[in-house]
Amino acid sequence: MKKLLYLLLVAVFAIISCCNTEQKHTAKVYMTKDISAEGLVKVYEALGVKPKGNVAVKISTGEPGGRNFLKPELIKELVQKVNGTIVECNVAYQGPRYTTEAHLQTAKEHGFLDIADVDIMDAEGEIIIPVKDTTHIKYNIVGSHLANYDYMINLAHFKGHGMGGFGGVLKNQSIGVASGNGKAYIHTAGVIDTKEKMWDRLFTTEQDHFLESMAAAAQSVHDYFKNGDNIIYINVMNNLSVDCDCSAHPADPTMKDIGILASKDPVALDQACVELVFAVVPEEGNDSAPLIERIKSRHGTHIIDHAEKIGLGSKKYELVNID
């Protein structure tokens, strides 16, 4: 009888433990359909965080000629609410954002200098930060000014991407926070760490290796900010083109805007956004097929799978509508 009771108790505790584990690995993702300055602040406040110290707001300044990047009037209220600095890094390809001077000129033309200070984080060089997953990249090369910040708001424009399939918060803090050389290192999955030589291997790198390298780099930035305690994630799902904001001639969006989503878990957030896109039944005026094809053809969701595998976050989430 005692043995039976003991086994029963063990079973009960095992079930409780399993349930608790499930709860711990289910992230909350907050969502509003209100794509406005007010909606952005509202979804940010739903996270219940209070950033302290120097706050970096990581966005994409957008390539000249592009039109889908997050506009200053959308992000102004949030950036000023947290007394944030807009941060970016130079790109690895020749163009208007290749040098700091030209990049700042682009930021000015796009209106970002009118709402906040803009810091090109690799303007004075780069630093190396550690990565946990060394399958491909052995370290992460980021803009040296990253060290000047105590907190980061990863504010991404969710959309398609020519190489990654889609770009959300994982891409925004991997390729986005990497210096020019760091971008080359990620794109070549740890083979080349000099942007001038990147083109020798850019198109011969295994696609999954590139995606896995992005996941590893994203994790290193997450861990850099006190193991994720000092970083939050927001995806704005508007202007859902198949092309990235790094394109000077992006395709027009074929589907309707969806909303703004936020979470403390970048894996859950990107997973939720991808599922929202896939849930749209293609129809006239709201055709999700091109973006879905872009994601599938690049095996884009592999970055999410790998990010979960290496412990960056969880694909399990609870979607909380705050409207």
Task: Write out the residue ranges for each language-model feature.
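Sec-dependent signal peptide recognition
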Residues: 2-9
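Extended, low-polarity segments enriched in aliphatic/aromatic residues
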Residues: 24-77, 81-323
